């Protein structure tokens, strides 16, 4: 399970250090793809297989299902950690996530997946989430 929030920098070659706590589960390789809210998602091969099966079950007759499949699969790349525990982020995914070369990134664990965010975007998303969480607690007790 992937937990926590970590600050890193995307290096000049488009690589991001993956926290050491996450590396063991990624030793057999992983898939990097587009995530919600302009983040990138890293999935283990097992999680990717499960997601692929769910995507295959979506009706091809629904436009939103086709668009979702296109977004997830066309942006996906097989990847592997290098000897320094870094993962290469291709240019198309850097553009999607608004993460510039030498830019600040936030790597978060979200249970079964890892998300990579532009730190600027992450702060905005996190502020919104914290506000919503506070409101949910007020309503639910």
Residue ranges with predicted function:
Residues 1-8, 12, 22-79, 83, ...:
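Flexible "stalk/tail and boundary" regions
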